[in-house]
């Protein structure tokens, strides 16, 4: 195969790979707990896996808590594992109104200046001084995915939600690149409802900014 034909073939393959669907992950309200906070809420009870998530090593746990805010409560909020260094609560704007909490839009882990909340388990309750956020929509990917899609960690991209009958483009989608991540876009339930992302054929693709 001559050089020009090889380059043309490689370019075509890469173009096709760039157009492949990006899996959608709809994040319902959930919590991450530090080992210390977990031990206080579930004393003497090890965290147990209920269902593996797409991202390697991450899972939905059997354990749930109630979120209690100034105006209301949300019950059966799932704990995601493994345990982290700092506790964090991720909710939607709709959830924030139910709870009466002014949760800011943040990337996971960016918790400075965030409001706190009361967590209630079947065994105990604690109050977090901070840690409640509305998660910024984002795409997880490996370095190879980033190379194919021509993006880098920290980029902000536009993404179209397709296959729903009500195509919707989201801008300000953060790119998160890590060697141990698999390609997946994360949106919350408010965003998913707006896009009809619960449709069986729903998927995401990178879109050109307007």
Curated annotation (Swiss-Prot):
The lineage of its organism: Bacteria, Pseudomonadati, Pseudomonadota, Gammaproteobacteria, Enterobacterales. Its cofactor is Zn(2+). There are 2 Zn(2+) ions per monomer; Zn(2+) and CoA bind inbetween the 2 domains in each monomer. This is Phosphate propanoyltransferase. Involved in 1,2-propanediol (1,2-PD) utilization within the bacterial microcompartment (BMC) dedicated to 1,2-PD degradation by catalyzing the conversion of propanoyl-CoA to propanoyl-phosphate. It comes from Citrobacter rodentium (strain ICC168) (Citrobacter freundii biotype 4280). Phosphate binds at residue 84. The gene is pduL. It holds the Pfam family PTAC. One of its GO terms (biological process) is propanediol catabolic process.
